[in-house]
């Protein structure tokens, strides 16, 4: 038997299904804007202001589910034998290292999700792995350092919205690994938990983008967990750089002056520069 399924622009937009050559579904491709909620108004400064002032009653229900579901599947990933067991491999001999724990739990959740575990996950920008990456490191850091539950919820607003902000320019589906954006978001959320606000978070975002923006997306599979670990590490490094008085500057590769200009440049890189890359990745994956 053979099957062919095509999705366009976002994860649930099925436009073609064929089985053994028989077309079961075929419909016109919608435009990139159709069926998607516009978030072009987002900015890092606005996200931080929102996190500081939002009535948590308006966002708590979804964030509580994100905490419960995403940590539950992370625990399952550490208990079980899933894929390449990236999470448990990272943790070996480094159980007391908080940065290691953040990478471990995020990777373990992806280990499980990418390799048959049916536990639910609260997503970000249509992706379970992005929802995991944006939330689990922030939750682990808050628990390990004794932050209040309110502080955690507000930090999750930052991490989720920064991830969404980056994905707005990139698009939900692309040749650019979504974990990169979510790892940046995680770094921003942890910066918020440590007391950082716009300046700290903006520098964390720019620094992290400069580190991991070359990672490609080649489908959902076991190595996604390793890419998540690398992306979380980049977010943590971006924050550590700012805390130690170091940064990447405009002109360092694709980095531009200002966080919003850098974010916009990544979107342009992906939408224009990586269009052919996406096609070639699919071609390579389909080779016998």
PLM regions and their residue ranges:
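Acidic-glycine-rich active-site phosphate/pyrophosphate-binding loop
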Residues: 97-116, 148-166, 205-214
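Functionally critical mobile loop/hinge segments
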Residues: 41-95, 101, 190, 195-288
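Active-site cradle of extracellular carbohydrate-active enzymes
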Residues: 126, 138-143, 149-157
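Conserved phosphate/anionic-ligand binding catalytic regions in large, soluble enzymes, centered on
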Residues: 117-136, 177-181
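C-terminal structural cap/anchor segments
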Residues: 172-173, 177, 181-202
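Alpha-helical support elements that line or immediately flank enzyme active sites
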Residues: 131-147, 187-195
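Flexible glycine-/small-residue-enriched beta->alpha junction loops
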Residues: 1-49
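Glycine/charged-rich beta-loop-alpha catalytic/anionic-binding loops adjacent to active sites
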Residues: 113-123, 163-173, 216-221
């Amino acid at each position: 038997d053979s099957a062919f399924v095509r999705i366009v622009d976002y994860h649930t937009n099925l436009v073609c299904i064929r089985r053994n050559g028989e077309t079961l579904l075929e419909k016109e491709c919608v435009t990139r804007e159709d069926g998607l909620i516009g978030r072009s108004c987002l900015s890092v400064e606005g996200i931080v202001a929102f996190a500081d002032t939002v009535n948590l009653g308006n966002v708590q229900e979804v964030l509580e589910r994100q905490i419960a579901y995403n940590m539950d599947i992370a625990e399952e990933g550490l208990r079980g034998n899933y894929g390449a067991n990236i999470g448990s491999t990272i943790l070996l001999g480094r159980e007391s290292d908080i940065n290691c724990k953040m990478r471990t739990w995020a990777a373990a959740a992806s280990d499980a999700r990418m390799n048959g575990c049916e536990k639910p996950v609260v997503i970000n920008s249509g992706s379970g792995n992005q929802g995991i990456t944006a939330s689990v490191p922030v939750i682990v850091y808050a628990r390990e350092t004794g932050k209040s539950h309110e502080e955690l919820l507000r930090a999750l607003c930052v991490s989720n919205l920064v991830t969404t902000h980056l994905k707005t320019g990139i698009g939900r589906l692309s040749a650019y690994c979504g974990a990169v954006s979510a790892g940046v978001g995680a770094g921003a959320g942890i910066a918020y938990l440590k007391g950082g606000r716009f300046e700290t978070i903006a520098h964390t975002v720019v620094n992290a983008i400069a580190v991991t923006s070359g990672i490609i997306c080649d489908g959902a599979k076991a190595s996604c967990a390793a890419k998540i670990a690398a992306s979380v590490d980049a977010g943590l490094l971006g924050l550590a750089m700012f805390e130690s008085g170091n940064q990447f500057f405009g002109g360092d590769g694709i980095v531009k002056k200002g966080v919003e200009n850098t974010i916009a440049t990544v979107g342009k890189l992906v939408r224009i520069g990586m269009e052919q890359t996406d096609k070639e990745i699919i071609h390579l994956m389909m080779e016998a």
